[in-house]
C-alpha cells in the first residue's frame, strides 16, 4: 500500500516517555524519546508505588537527558493540602535546576511555580477539555496543557487551532475509567485516594453483584437462595482497555498536537523501550512520507509483546462503548520475561558477557534481555554459549556461561523472553471490535 502524504510544514511532535526508574529512563532515551517525565517521593499520581526517583536520581536523570538533548519534566500533579504547601515549594525549589518544566494539577502549585520561575504544564487531572479553559490556563502562566482524555480528535483540533498554547495528548497506555482520572473508588473501598497517588486499582478486579431486595413465594414465605448473589466472572466491568493510537498517529499529527504522551511510569523498562521505539518509528515515517497502514499494523503487533490490557482507540472518535472495556484480568502481553541471573563480567574487546545462571536456564536460540540503570535494555538472541573452552547447548541453573552480548555492566539483570500463555477470551464477540474499523 502506498505511503500517506502530508504537508511538509507539519509540526513534528515531541515523544514524551515515562520513567519509573533509571533503567526505564535509559531505555526511553535509547529508543528515541524527546522528553521524559518522572516523579519524586511525594505529590504525584504514582506516589504510592516504587516508580519514583530519589533526589540524587533526579540530578542524574537530568544529566542523562541533557547529554542526549532530551527534556525532563517533573510530575507534581496530586491534590495539595494547606499543610503541604511548604513541602511542595521546597521540592520544586530543589528540582528547578534539573527540570525543564513541572506537570501540575493544583493552582496553588501553579502560583509556586510562577514565584520560582519554573515553567509548568497543566496535568490532564485538571480536565482541560475546551479552548476557553486552555486560554484561561495560558493566562495564568501555563506553557502547556495536557488535554483531558475525554476530548475527541475534532475537539483537540479546535483547541489547538484557537488556544495558542502547546498541547499534549496521551497516545498510548492505561486508561482510567473515571473522568480525567479523578476516581474516588479506591478511597471509598480502601481509604486510599487515587487523587493523592494511592490508587489500589479496584477497577481492575472482578466483582460480586448482590441482590438486596428479598423475594417471596406465592404464600409470602421469604426466598433465600444462592441466586441472590452473582459473581461477575471471569469478566471485568470497570477495566478499560489500553489506548493505542498507532493506527491513526498521522491524524493526531495533522491536528497539530505538540507532544505525544506515553503512559506507564509504573510499567517495565522493556515496555518503555518497545512502545517508545514504535512511536518514534511511526512519527518519523509520517514526517518522511513513508507511513502506511501496513507499517502501523506492524508496530501495533510489536507493542502487543509487552504489558497491555488489549487495545482501543480511546475517546478520540467518540464516547466509550462496551468494546472499550477489556475482558482480560491481567496483561495480554504475548511475551513474558523470566529471571535468568546477573552479569558478573563483561569483556569489552571480545563483546562477551559472563552470566551467572541463578534461576532459569538459557539455551542456544533463546531470546534474552539484559537490563541495567546504565545499560538500559538490550534484547538479542543467544548465538553461542561457552564455559571456559567447553561449547554448551544449554547453561543450567547454578552454573555460569559466556555469550556474545551488546555492552552491559556487572550487576545487570538477565532475563529469558518466552511466549506468554494464551489468554482465553471470556466475553462475547459482540463486545469487541477492531481498531481499524474505528479509524
Regions found by a protein language model. Give the residues of each.
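Surface-exposed amphipathic alpha-helical tracts and adjacent flexible/coil segments at the periphery
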Residues: 6-31, 35-47, 59-62, 68-83, ...
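Short glycine-enriched loops at secondary-structure junctions
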Residues: 21, 78, 105-109, 126-128
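Short coil/turn segments at secondary-structure boundaries
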Residues: 49-52, 79-86, 101
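Well-ordered mid-protein domain cores that form the structural environment of catalytic cofactors
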Residues: 86-123
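Conserved nucleotide-cofactor-binding alpha/beta core module
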Residues: 130-132
